[in-house]
């Protein structure tokens, strides 16, 4: 099985790898061609006989298939999406303890921008919009933003309940260790929500008016990650209504955690 598309796609569809191994078929070895950066997430996957970034020298095999073609070949429907969670676990349980912030009971990780690509403008919620939540009591907001956009949080870290973890994210295994300590990950559509969802950490996904295909339309849940929720723009570019919808939902969590 060889990877394709981006990191989020790989994390979302790797759930199908154990299904291949469990098929009622002659015994076979399963090789997974995976980007080096993601390999630490699969160290305990017994279904894989070999995992590597094979590049231009793949092993000799009898069959091969792109990762994202597996749902079609296995006849997946909305009702049969493999949704047992978690299917990824934190491989670095002793890596890093997220610093507690005084007076808070709820840890919320925030991500507001995707990689700078063709869909960048559509997949960015201005940090100023998310900052409208920073006045909420009892919530610690932790910046999980990667890349150059992480610096945008610097204007808000003087607040006692806002802290950037950009310098601690490291590799995907380090990021997983941090995500595991969050109560909620509030993020635009990027690989972070797939990593959180696969670990069964609630991802609250902020979606543009015209979302990616995997999130469907007219629903606030997702069959891919049963513990996660979708918050959709009501008009193109309207992130304010998304934040307005999220605020009372956070208040419910605060009440439950006090």
Where are these regions (language model features)?
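Catalytic machinery of carbohydrate-active enzymes
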Residues: 1-258
């Amino acid at each position: 099985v060889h990877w394709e598309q981006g990191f989020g796609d790989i994390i979302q569809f790797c759930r199908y790898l154990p299904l291949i191994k469990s098929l009622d078929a002659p015994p076979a070895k399963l090789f997974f061609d995976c980007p080096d950066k993601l390999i630490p997430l699969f160290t305990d996957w017994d279904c894989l006989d070999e995992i590597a970034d094979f590049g231009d020298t793949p092993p000799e095999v009898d069959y091969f298939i792109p990762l994202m073609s597996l749902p079609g070949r296995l006849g997946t429907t909305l009702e049969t999406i493999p949704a047992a969670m978690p299917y990824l676990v934190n491989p670095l349980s002793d890596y890093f303890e997220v610093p507690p912030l005084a007076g808070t009971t709820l840890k919320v990780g925030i991500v507001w921008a995707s990689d700078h690509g063709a869909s960048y403008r559509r997949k960015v919620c201005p940090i100023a919009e998310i900052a409208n939540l920073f006045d909420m009591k009892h919530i610690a907001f932790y910046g999980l933003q990667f890349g150059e956009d992480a610096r945008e949080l610097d204007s808000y870290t003087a607040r006692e309940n806002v802290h950037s973890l950009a310098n601690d994210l490291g590799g995907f295994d380090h990021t997983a260790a941090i995500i595991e300590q969050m109560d909620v990950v509030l993020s635009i559509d990027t690989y972070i929500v797939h990593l959180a969802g696969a670990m069964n950490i609630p991802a609250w996904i902020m979606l543009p008016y015209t979302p990616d295909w995997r999130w469907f339309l007219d629903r606030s849940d997702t069959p891919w990650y049963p513990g996660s929720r979708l918050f959709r723009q009501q008009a193109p570019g309207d992130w304010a209504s998304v934040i307005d919808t999220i605020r009372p939902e956070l208040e419910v969590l605060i009440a439950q955690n006090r």
